Amino acid sequence: MNLNGEQKSAVLLALVGIDKAIEILKELSIQEIENIAKCMSYMDVISSITADLVLSEFCNEVRINKDQNISFINNNFIISLLKKVLGEHHAVLLLDKFKNQKNISDNIKKLNLINPEKIVSLIKGEHPQIIATILIYLNRNHAANILSYFEDNLSLDIIRRIANFSSLKKLGQEEFVKIIDNLINKYQNSMLNQQGIVTAVELLKLIKRDQETKILTKMFSSDKVLAKRIKTKMLEFSDIINLDDVYIRRLIKVFPLYELSEIMKVEKEEFKKKFYKNMSLENTNLIKNYCSKKIFISNDLIQKKRNNLLNSVKKILYNS
């Protein structure tokens, strides 16, 4: 574990105990105290090995029990320390500040791992200022991908708010923590629900086709919404060719022509005809012209475009 100077100072203060730590902190500036305290609030537990390395760097005479770990949170070390150095009021304010910052940091890490489209579905109902603030904290590439899903006017509003952003005030910080916590909870609940759908789909795919049909038919009569979710999830790319023409025409209206052209270039003639008969002659000729060109398209890109097309089909079917 690589520690910077302030982190090493935090470890050392934890080892020398409250009384000696107080005497040391009295010699430091308020900013230095805040920086070290912030390190303590973020570090949580330090292994005895790491602590021993810090000790050996500063003082060869000091050693610790090899079974002893250092916890800044569980033993209330930082709380007692700050109260004695800064007074209870300032200590509480500082600890609340660190707690909020840590919560934001932890949850932003989680948001950075969530698919951009999923995040859009989570935040699209939020105020543009909330969306802008979330994007500020996210990884830049991740934030850019999320922004691309919004319509132009909203994107412009979000960018303007990002450009004018200065900082989160204390009250705003606390509210922001609650908002992100809520988003994470909504995502986790949706994932649990989604996992149930996935399991149901996997089971239906393993049973005989006529039995699957009977189950879905009965489900449509008792719980149409759930049945549609399962049926939509079961759809595969190869099933697109069997869709009714009315769905193909809806798909053509919403799916980018250039992406469809890339897919068509590698698909069989039967698949192409399914789309050609449902689109204008102009678009048909544009796709045919593209397919006739010698253009290399990677398998990864083709698979991505196919997934995009399949997802568009699923949305149409689910909302119909």
From Swiss-Prot:
InterPro entries: Flg_Motor_Flig, Flg_Motor_Flig_C, FliG_a-hlx, FliG_M, FliG_N. The record marks R161 as: Part of the EHPQR-motif. The keyword Cell inner membrane applies. It comes from the Bacteria. One of its GO terms (biological process) is bacterial-type flagellum-dependent cell motility. The keyword Transit peptide does not apply. It is found in: Cell inner membrane; Bacterial flagellum basal body. Keywords: Bacterial flagellum, Cell inner membrane, Cell membrane, Chemotaxis, Flagellar rotation, Membrane. A motif (Part of the EHPQR-motif) lies at residues 126-129. It is a peripheral membrane protein. Its main location: membrane. One of its GO terms (molecular function) is cytoskeletal motor activity. GO terms for cellular component: bacterial-type flagellum basal body; plasma membrane. Belongs to the FliG family. FliG is one of three proteins (FliG, FliN, FliM) that forms the rotor-mounted switch complex (C ring), located at the base of the basal body. This complex interacts with the CheY and CheZ chemotaxis proteins, in addition to contacting components of the motor that determine the direction of flagellar rotation. This is Flagellar motor switch protein FliG.
